[in-house]
Design a protein with these regions (language model features):
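Short beta-strand/loop motifs in extracellular/secreted proteins, especially
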Residues: 61-63, 96-98, 149, 466-470
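C-terminal outer-membrane/trafficking sorting elements
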Residues: 18-21, 441-450, 454-523
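Bacterial Sec-dependent N-terminal signal peptides
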Residues: 1-24, 438, 523
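Short, well-structured beta-strand/strand-turn elements
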Residues: 141-152, 272
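Internal "kinase-insert"/substrate-recognition segments embedded within catalytic cores
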Residues: 97-107, 121-122, 141-146, 158-267, ...
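A conserved alpha-helical element in kinase catalytic cores
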Residues: 123-143
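Middle-to-C-terminal accessory/interaction subdomains
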Residues: 24-29, 33-36, 46, 55, ...
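Conserved oxyanion/phosphate-binding beta-strand-loop segments in alpha/beta enzyme cores
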Residues: 63-121
Length: 523
């Protein structure tokens, strides 16, 4: 199967070229894989007790910050610091996950244009790099994810631990990753600790209050309008199968979403929409009027979160090494409807096979793991607050680690062994040579248009066809309709407002093959 070219991968290339002249905000922290030094000085006595006391209220505390990256050392007075996380808060010592807000107390204060940084404590991860590797592969594969790096963190002169630094999903992320920040950005709710409010994209009615525990609006908070998200969920849940199939590509960036789902499945990353129905963002892009999917919180990738529930590694009754490509928990209507559609599921398999061939394999991922291991080894050894031993760290790069019961216990899969085992299983489940490639699909066949004459609506049906450009022109040659559908084989076009007369349909596919047909509107 030939490698496909994807919008985000191309965007990343052009942004890289542009950056010769103009840097993206955050490049000092995230451009190169490096280990930052973060030195926080708190002036309160018993500062950590205060941090813990503020955990439930998410209140920030003041601290002075000295940050060292590959470009130099920078000092910032009075940044805001607070503890964060759900399961990660159960880390058995004081090495908790936390967040820094540069301008919480000093208005406009930023580092390299960045306002906030998140610090993950590598809970349940002897390798100390699960999240970083997962995000690296996702980003390379053209999926929207936060940038990440590593850091040695000091509190009041004491080495607190080795952390993964993760970019905040906010307007600055939208600026560089999507090139649009005017729309609504929603974060999936945590639904942690037994909460029965998963961000499952189920339609619960038209009232915003029915969703406030499930989704949090992160932009345009003053307006606080969830109508667009509710309308999308209405579409997902209440459309006919034909309408869902034909219109989904108009509602969201479908290629990137299918790739995002495929990566969650391959990495058995089920603390996501696929499983727990959390840890994602949805952004309504005002430039395209489409929804875009952003991953979040990848610390349970490589099979550390059980498929189907169950409370910990190995639970849930499903072997995460042998999860089928179309696995999802119940009540995930977006995935259920995609997988129920022959054409959309085929589109998913196309993306799946492309990633399996080019990214999710030992040849691609093992060198990334080795590079990170060599970079962080001495820092991990120096971390006296980590959950696992130095031997566990070394062994978990390639092999499973077992460490008793409780949080972080059970069998934790080795990074390299997980990839090789998962690939071996998936190659036995999917014959990618039998998945028709994009290049083989681009010849349009059996084009139909009916009824003809029409009065209110016309239906277009065809076989094959990728990279389609559909144009309808009136008798004077004026363009009255244009569409670029993907992964569908039918389309309904409302014509009830069009004038009576003769119209010309022109179908062009990516290989340049064109078909035309004349029809009329009579009333």
């Amino acid at each position: 199967m030939k490698t496909r070219k994807h919008t985000l991968a191309l965007m990343a290339f052009f942004i890289g070229v542009t950056n010769v002249f103009a840097q993206i905000e955050g490049d000092k922290i995230f451009k190169n894989t490096q280990i930052l030094t973060i030195e926080l000085t708190f002036h309160q006595t018993s500062f950590f007790d205060s941090l813990e006391a503020n955990y439930l209220t998410a209140e920030y505390m003041k601290a002075d910050l000295v940050l060292t990256d590959s470009t130099g050392t920078y000092s910032y007075p009075e940044v805001g610091v607070r503890l964060k996380g759900n399961s990660t808060y159960n880390h058995p010592n004081n090495k908790k996950a936390f967040k820094i807000d540069f301008n919480e107390y000093v208005s406009g204060q930023k580092h390299d244009g960045i306002k906030k940084l998140n610090f993950s404590n590598n809970f349940k991860d002897p390798s100390m790099m699960r999240e970083k590797v997962f995000f690296d592969v996702c980003k390379a594969a053209g999926v929207l994810v936060p940038r990440s790096n590593f850091a040695n963190v000091y509190f009041n002169g004491t080495l607190w631990g080795f952390y993964t630094v993760v970019e905040q999903i906010d307007d600055q992320f939208l600026d560089w990753a999507i090139l649009d920040d005017d729309g609504n950005l929603f974060k999936a709710g945590d639904n942690f600790g037994g909460s029965n409010t998963p961000a499952d994209l189920v339609y619960y009615g038209s009232t915003a209050s029915d969703y406030t525990d499930r989704y949090e609006l992160k932009t345009n908070e003053d307006v606080n309008d969830m109508t667009d998200l509710i309308d999308f969920m209405d579409f997902v849940n209440n459309s006919t199968s034909a309408n869902f199939e034909s219109q989904l590509f108009n509602k969201m960036e479908l290629n990137e979403y299918l790739r995002s789902v495929a990566l969650d499945n391959m990495f058995s990353n089920f603390d996501s929409y696929t499983g727990s129905a959390r840890n994602y963002y949805m952004y309504h892009n005002m430039s395209t009027d489409k929804w875009e999917w952003v991953k979040w919180d990848g610390n349970e990738a490589f099979g550390s979160y059980p498929a189907g529930g169950g409370g910990g590694p190995g639970g849930g009754g499903n072997n995460v090494l042998t999860i089928d490509p179309d696995y999802h928990d119940a009540d995930r209507p977006l995935l259920e409807n995609i997988f129920a559609s022959t054409s959309l599921y085929h589109a998913y398999l196309l993306e799946y096979c492309d990633i399996l061939e080019n990214y999710f394999n030992s040849s691609y991922i093992d060198p990334i793991i080795d590079s990170h291991y060599n970079l962080i080894k001495s820092s991990v050894y120096a971390d006296n607050n980590k959950m696992y031993t130095d031997a566990d760290f070394d062994n978990n790069i390639s092999s499973n680690v077992s460490s008793g019961s409780g949080p972080g216990g059970g069998t934790i899969y080795g990074l390299k062994s997980f990839i090789s085992s998962r690939v071996s299983y998936l190659e036995g489940e999917i014959d990618c040579d039998d998945i028709v490639s994009v290049e083989d699909m681009d010849k349009v066949e059996n084009l139909e248009l009916f009824p003809n004459p029409a009065s209110e609506q016309i239906t277009l049906k065809w076989e094959n066809g990728v990279g389609l450009d559909i144009k309808i022109l009136d008798s004077k040659g004026v363009l009255v309709y244009q569409n670029n559908p993907e992964y569908i084989n039918s389309l309904n076009v409302d014509v009830d407002s069009w004038a009576t007369g003769i119209y010309h349909l022109v179908f062009t596919s990516s290989n340049g093959t064109a078909k035309s047909q004349t029809f009329s509107i009579l009333r």
